[in-house]
Curated annotation (Swiss-Prot):
It comes from the Bacteria. This is Urease subunit beta. Pathway: Nitrogen metabolism; urea degradation; CO(2) and NH(3) from urea (urease route): step 1/1. It comes from Trichodesmium erythraeum (strain IMS101). One of its GO terms (biological process) is urea catabolic process.
Length: 102
């Protein structure tokens, strides 16, 4: 075994199984690239990203941990979001929520 190595069972592992997801079309209206990490509360991302925000409250990108999605200036793409699990307490980020979600 190598330090830090993870040995999993044979077969596929389904990420975020059973959690609610939504599809959102996002456009970068800014003049600089914007990168969003896997566990950032999507509702609170950079204001230069244009999309319908309210449905994204309590959601994050449905991508593997430690990865990110990059939006170049003028880019428009569809992303899948997944509900944040655990205690569903959202604090920090851009301080738009700072409370436990319902």
């Amino acid at each position: 075994m190598i330090p830090g190595e993870i040995i999993t069972q044979i077969g596929e592992i389904e990420l975020n199984s059973g959690r609610s997801t939504i599809q959102v079309i996002v456009a970068n209206t800014g003049d600089r690239p914007i990168q969003i990490g896997s566990h950032f509360h999507f509702y609170e991302v950079n204001s230069a990203l244009e999309f319908e925000r309210e449905p994204t409250k309590g959601m994050r990108l449905n991508i593997p941990a430690g990865t990110a999605v990059r939006f170049e200036p003028g880019d428009e793409k569809e992303v899948e979001l997944v509900a944040i699990a655990g205690s569903r307490e959202i604090y920090g980020f851009n301080s738009l929520v700072n409370q436990k979600l319902e």
